[in-house]
């Protein structure tokens, strides 16, 4: 496309040729992408019916691929619409004073194939006079749908999942307003050593205060925190005991008596068994120290010795 030096109608047309070619490419880009998107939607509807009869795993993979293709097509359309919005369209309007009816009549739409899209479904398109209105309306519709799908990034970050479905996300407070838990109260510091009120501790009154503060020693009768109690220790324990604790105590006492009786019987039997063994035979055949085990072993040997003597 060379530029001529002539003035008039042909010169004005030559000046408009670069801008019109750009607009043709943009229109071709938008129309082809729109047709691709519409054809893909029809194809998706047919695939949905077929995918309902297939396995669950294959249908999920197909849907993910289709969603990725749809998102790519929408991104291409958005970029094209932004390009159209950024262009100056005043030169297309017939409101210029130096334009004549012949000038507007000589500007004819030209058929172009878009070099930006490498598809076999690309068809020749023309520039419609309503291109600007269609581009702006479609751009606003796409922005609304994107806002619906993405929602607010702050609410999504606070909520943890996309979409404005949950109404509770609108009432979430920022981090600076979230109430913080109250700090736990510090435990009360008690003295390390507490002496009873009747203790005989000889300390001079001058060194009493310094020693008590340094060593942490407090007398029970002088402390406002630890007041002397009039009841005895055994009475307080008996009040705390329940019926189940009393039953456990009875079982423990009975078991203790039974064990003591068993040990007494064993001790009496061992003493009687040791008395039945003669002292002379015990000195000759038993060399270990006397114990319960040696007494039983010596008794077994003496019984075998008696059996041999009887058999002979």
Curated annotation (Swiss-Prot):
Compartment(s) where it occurs, according to its Swiss-Prot or TrEMBL record: Cytoplasm; Nucleus
- Region annotation Transcription activation domain: residue ranges? 75-99
Q: Which GO terms describe its molecular function?
A: DNA-binding transcription factor activity; protein dimerization activity; sequence-specific DNA binding
Gene Ontology cellular component annotations, sorted alphabetically = cytoplasm; nucleus
What residues does the bHLH domain cover? 250-306
Task: Write the record's keywords in alphabetical order, separated by commas.
Answer: Activator, Cytoplasm, DNA-binding, Nucleus, Phosphoprotein, Transcription, Transcription regulation
Principal place of residence? cytoplasm
User: Region entry Interaction with PHO2: which residue ranges?
Assistant: 201-218
- The gene is PHO4
- Supply the domain comment: The 9aaTAD motif (residues 75 to 83) is a transactivation domain present in a large number of yeast and animal transcription factors.
Q: Sites of the modification Phosphoserine?
A: 100, 114, 128, 152, 204, 223, 242-243
Q: What does this protein do?
A: Transcriptional activator that regulates the expression of repressible phosphatase under phosphate starvation conditions. Binds to the upstream activating sequence (UAS) of several phosphatase encoding PHO genes. Inhibited by the cyclin-CDK PHO80-PHO85 under high-phosphate conditions.
Motif 9aaTAD location, chain numbering: 75-83
Feature: compositional bias, Basic and acidic residues: 248-259
**UniProt region (Involved in oligomerization), positions on chain:** 203-227
Compositionally biased tracts (Low complexity)? 49-62, 211-235
Sorted alphabetically, the Gene Ontology BP terms of this entry are:
cellular response to phosphate starvation; chromatin remodeling; negative regulation of transcription by RNA polymerase II; positive regulation of phosphate metabolic process; positive regulation of transcription by RNA polymerase II
Renumbered ranges of motif Nuclear localization signal: 140-166
The annotated subunit structure for this chain is: Binds DNA as a homodimer. Interacts with transcription factor PHO2 and binds cooperatively to PHO5 UAS. Interacts with the cyclin-CDK PHO80-PHO85 and the CDK inhibitor (CKI) PHO81.
Map out region (Disordered) in residue numbers: 35-71, 138-259
Top-level division of the source organism's lineage: Eukaryota
Question: What's one Pfam family the UniProt record gives for this protein?
Answer: HLH
Q: Could you identify this protein by its name?
A: Phosphate system positive regulatory protein PHO4
Q: Where is this region: Interaction with PHO80?
A: 1-31, 156-200
> Compositional bias of type Polar residues: which residue ranges?
138-154, 196-210
